[in-house]
């Protein structure tokens, strides 16, 4: 059994209900949102409308919708930022690095000059904060670990609008 992170209320459900300005794109089964932690400028997450925690919990229709949404935002990120690459990833359970108990699929434009290394940029922050990889998430370390990637609401809104304007028709 995979151990799940606990957050109540669910921050991704709150985005869907109360912070609609963070939504870049939407479909029947998904929302694409700007990640509040900009490890790379333009980092987005595709989330399910239905509150489920794991890839293992998704329906086949939701799985297909997630990849379609990820491709749409990846195309918009490519147009908007001309990145060197686009990283996609998803974590299942706290021991894989999942911090929010709501399915989300990261879509990250990798920029020239990035010093996060290869792979998910969040993992690089674990080492610098003294958190060994593969350990349970402790929200108490978020402030130190995420200090470098915090963006203001204005910056997030502007970035979201730039990406939104480049979504495929």
Go through each PLM region and give its residues.
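HIT superfamily nucleotide-processing domains
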Residues: 1-169
């Amino acid at each position: 059994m995979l151990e799940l992170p606990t957050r109540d209320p669910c921050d991704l459900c709150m985005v869907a209900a109360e912070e609609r300005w963070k939504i870049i794109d939407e479909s029947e089964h998904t929302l694409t949102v700007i990640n509040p932690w900009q490890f790379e400028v333009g980092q987005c997450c595709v989330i399910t409308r239905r509150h489920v925690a794991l890839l293992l919990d998704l329906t086949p229709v939701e799985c297909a919708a997630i990849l379609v949404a990820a491709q749409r935002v990846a195309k918009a990120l490519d147009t908007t930022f001309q990145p060197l690459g686009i990283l996609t990833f998803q974590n299942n359970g706290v021991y894989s690095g999942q911090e929010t108990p709501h399915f989300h699929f990261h879509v990250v434009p990798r920029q020239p000059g990035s010093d996060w290394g290869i792979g998910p940029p969040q993992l690089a922050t674990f080492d610098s904060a003294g958190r060994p990889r593969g350990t349970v998430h402790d929200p108490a370390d978020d402030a130190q670990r995420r200090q470098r990637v915090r963006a203001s609401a204005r910056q997030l809104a502007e970035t979201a609008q730039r990406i939104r304007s480049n979504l495929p028709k």
